[in-house]
């Protein structure tokens, strides 16, 4: 199997895993921390907004089965790409959305997708999700991995209570909520 990586942030990483897990070609989705300057940060350190890291997921995929463009299609249906100050009721640096590109192809695809969404006018405000070069990814603690499976009731309550589920449904229907 050929493999590539997509590293994406869209607020709380608990809500960024499930939408990707059932798609063909996606081999794994790992919650973690990306983009900062601290080595091997903990959840508590990242939450202080002093590590430079954001909560993110790193997706391992087979490019012979799915494309980075398909992953971006899913990604943009999981969060509010018009808000760069956090996501829903999670505010601050560690919850900012970011696309971390691994190569020139990913950068171009991300720029094109942003432009396309802005031209389509799906959102009332412009899509402003930053596109940055990938520099690091540190897996989060085990209790954060596959949170939606380990804690389904809390996951559902969090999604609903944060406003994420309502936002996604209002823009995209039930497909990723």
From Swiss-Prot:
**EC number(s) for this protein?**
1.8.4.11
Q: Name one GO biological process term.
A: protein modification process
Top-level class of the enzyme under EC nomenclature: oxidoreductase
Please give the InterPro entries that the UniProt record associates with this protein: Met_Sox_Rdtase_MsrA_dom (IPR002569), Met_Sox_Rdtase_MsrA_sf (IPR036509)
Identify which residues the record assigns to the active site: 12
The reply to whether Oxidoreductase figures as a keyword in the UniProt entry is: yes
GO molecular function terms attached to this record: L-methionine:thioredoxin-disulfide S-oxidoreductase activity; peptide-methionine (S)-S-oxide reductase activity
Q: Does the keyword Oxidoreductase apply?
A: yes
Q: Which reaction does it catalyse?
A: L-methionyl-[protein] + [thioredoxin]-disulfide + H2O = L-methionyl-(S)-S-oxide-[protein] + [thioredoxin]-dithiol; [thioredoxin]-disulfide + L-methionine + H2O = L-methionine (S)-S-oxide + [thioredoxin]-dithiol
Give the UniProt keywords, A-Z: Oxidoreductase
Task: Tell me, in a sentence or two, what this protein's role is.
Answer: Has an important function as a repair enzyme for proteins that have been inactivated by oxidation. Catalyzes the reversible oxidation-reduction of methionine sulfoxide in proteins to methionine.
| Family (UniProt) | Belongs to the MsrA Met sulfoxide reductase family.
Protein name per its UniProtKB record: Peptide methionine sulfoxide reductase MsrA 2
**Gene that specifies this protein:** msrA2
């Amino acid at each position: 199997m050929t493999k590539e990586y997509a590293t994406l942030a869209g607020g709380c990483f608990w809500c960024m895993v499930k939408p990707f897990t059932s798609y063909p070609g996606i081999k794994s989705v790992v919650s973690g921390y990306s983009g900062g300057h601290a080595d091997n940060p903990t959840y508590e350190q990242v939450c202080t907004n002093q590590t430079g890291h954001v909560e993110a997921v790193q997706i391992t995929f087979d490019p012979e089965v799915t494309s980075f463009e398909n992953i971006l299609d899913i990604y943009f249906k999981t969060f509010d790409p018009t808000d760069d100050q956090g996501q829903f009721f999670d505010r601050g640096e560690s919850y900012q959305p970011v696309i971390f590109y691994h190569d020139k192809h990913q950068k171009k695809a991300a720029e094109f997708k942003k432009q396309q969404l802005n031209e389509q006018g799906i959102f009332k405000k412009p899509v402003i999700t930053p596109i940055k070069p990938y520099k690091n990814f540190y897996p989060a603690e085990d209790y954060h991995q596959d949170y939606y499976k380990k804690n389904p009731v809390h996951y559902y309550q969090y999604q609903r209570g944060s406003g994420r589920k309502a936002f996604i449904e209002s823009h995209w229907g039930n497909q990723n909520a």
